[in-house]
Amino acid sequence: MNDTDVQNQIQQMVRFMRQEAEEKANEISVSAEEEFNIEKLQLVEAEKKKIRQEYERKAKQVDVRRKIEYSMQLNASRIKVLQAQDDLVNAMKEAASKELLLVSGDHHQYRNLLKELIVQSLLRLKEPAVLLRCREEDKHHVHRVLHSAREEYGEKACVSHPEVIVDDIHLPPAPTSYDSHELSCSGGVVMASRDGKIVFENTLDARLEVAFRKKLPQIRKQLFAV
């Protein structure tokens, strides 16, 4: 093999090595690009996932706030409705209280009412001796009906006529005005056992309060259909 052949063979080997090196370099480049694209895609997907999670979190927060605000508005509306209902019911009660002031105006009917209240109180107490308290302006009415009230009680309870002492301490007078906040009494009596352990309040105001509480569910049902 002469020098020319040797030189050609060397050049051929160099070309082969260069080609192999270029192919390897190309493979490395392609592989690196593929890995880069994969990592880039993974980063993009991770960022997308992060953005979706953040959006979902904020959307949930907005939904929760919206539900809270709706609940607060609904509760506020309910409170307003309940307050309006209470105002109407209280206005009815106040109107009834004003009507009570007219009861004692008819002396004849009021005396009969006082007698019924006294008999009812005696039947409730069932005591041989009781203390009766009334308004100062009603004292003469009480004295006029007291004897017949004691007799009626004795007949109904089948007992002797009880001793009834009219107290010198009086119930508060009728209110001086409709919007008065002072202690007042529209009429009726308060009776108690002599030792004061048993007390029966049978004033017009107390009877109205009892009747109103008893009828309140029915009143609300008729007014508000609930």
From Swiss-Prot:
GO molecular function: proton-transporting ATPase activity, rotational mechanism
Stored Pfam families: vATP-synt_E
Domain of life: Eukaryota
Key word Coiled coil present: no
Record-level GO cellular component terms: proton-transporting two-sector ATPase complex, catalytic domain
Keywords: Hydrogen ion transport, Ion transport, Transport
Subunit structure: V-ATPase is a heteromultimeric enzyme composed of a peripheral catalytic V1 complex (components A to H) attached to an integral membrane V0 proton pore complex (components: a, c, c', c'' and d).
Family of this protein: Belongs to the V-ATPase E subunit family.
Protein task: Subunit of the peripheral V1 complex of vacuolar ATPase essential for assembly or catalytic function. V-ATPase is responsible for acidifying a variety of intracellular compartments in eukaryotic cells.
Protein name as catalogued: V-type proton ATPase subunit E
Organism: Mesembryanthemum crystallinum
Gene giving rise to this polypeptide: VATE
